[in-house]
């Protein structure tokens, strides 16, 4: 690996070159502005004053443009193939609405801890999540009738899994919280 510095447009850039031909160039803020893979593909990126990637292109002519809100969240993207997508966020920065120009749309709801508790899309799929006080998923269900449950020990390790199809798994851990034993309702058993 070889590291050099250059002046580009009046600004110092770091250049890293590897023996296999990989080449990377970073701006003064540490953002990758140019990448060349060992097979010759190249990528260039531009950033706004907050370090958000606003434009990228590759050596095949594919390009992507991005827009961000005042909190640095990506709110709009479009590419040179004509694909376009938009996102909206709540006051905590969680994505609550997503849509694209090919007809997909999604909505999400969150609890006060920022955990996703509800998802639905415009194709009719919907699911719900419940969490324990540590933020671990303890119950999941979807509108197709599938459900699963998790139980955790005091260290947050999953000790039991059960789903609506009747399948179950049990887990045991050592004092270092490494899983040492697992068994399920199919008769499969592992020791680690």
Outline where the language-model segments fall.
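N-terminal targeting and processing segments
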Residues: 1-30
